[in-house]
């Protein structure tokens, strides 16, 4: 995801080269002499991890990939959306991972016309909220002692409705316009 939006992992953290078993890389500019990807890919290849490169051309990193998927330039985002669509459709989403490491259970305000419609619901201290299934109430999303919901419509203390962000993602990307045939 970082490269798709123009970032680079050496600025924001890097893949777990020591434990990765399957590494999928999307269209990376290969113009950095000291690029740490080279070292990381060497570690992956030595350990026998699978390396898949998604890039319009099979040069550089793609040439050493275990599998190369050649796509049209500028369509990597569409491919990611089609993959999300298929994973959702096949019910192959690791919800435990999403709950622990992402904002999937964070509640999103559903109040058409309000200034904060579509924003994360927050408590008085500004902490994002989730719905705790065990207590049947809102709770700080980052609390470790809750059982967060990832689907459903819930009522916030102020009476407004909110849904987990994962539900919004699923509703959008399960639409057939994101199927592999459509994109």
Enumerate the predicted regions with their spans.
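Generic recognition of flexible, low-complexity loop/linker segments
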Residues: 10-14, 40, 183
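Long, well-ordered, tryptophan-enriched scaffold segments
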Residues: 62-63, 67-183
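Anionic-ligand anchoring segments at beta-strand to alpha-helix junctions in alpha/beta enzyme folds, i.e.
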Residues: 1-19
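Short, polar loop motifs at secondary-structure junctions
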Residues: 54-60
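Glycine/threonine-rich flexible loop motifs
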Residues: 30-39
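A short helix->loop->beta-strand "cap" motif at the edges of active sites that frequently abuts
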Residues: 43-50
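Short acidic, glycine-rich surface-loop motifs adjacent to enzyme active sites
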Residues: 19-31
């Amino acid at each position: 995801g970082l490269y798709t939006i123009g970032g680079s992992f050496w600025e924001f953290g890097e893949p777990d080269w020591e434990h990765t078993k399957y590494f999928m890389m999307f269209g990376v500019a290969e113009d950095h002499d000291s690029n740490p990807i080279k070292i990381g890919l060497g570690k992956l290849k030595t350990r026998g991890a699978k390396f898949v490169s998604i890039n319009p051309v099979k040069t550089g990193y793609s040439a050493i990939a275990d599998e190369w998927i050649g796509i049209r330039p500028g369509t990597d985002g569409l491919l990611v959306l089609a993959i999300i669509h298929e994973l959702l459709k096949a019910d192959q989403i690791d919800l435990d991972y999403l709950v622990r490491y992402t904002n999937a259970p964070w509640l999103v305000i559903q109040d058409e016309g309000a200034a904060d419609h579509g924003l994360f619901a927050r408590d008085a201290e500004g902490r994002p909220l989730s719905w705790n299934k065990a207590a049947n109430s809102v709770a700080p999303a980052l609390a470790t002692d809750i059982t967060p919901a990832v689907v459903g419509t819930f009522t916030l203390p102020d009476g407004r409705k909110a849904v987990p962000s994962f539900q919004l993602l699923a509703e959008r990307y399960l639409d057939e316009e994101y199927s592999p045939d459509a994109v």
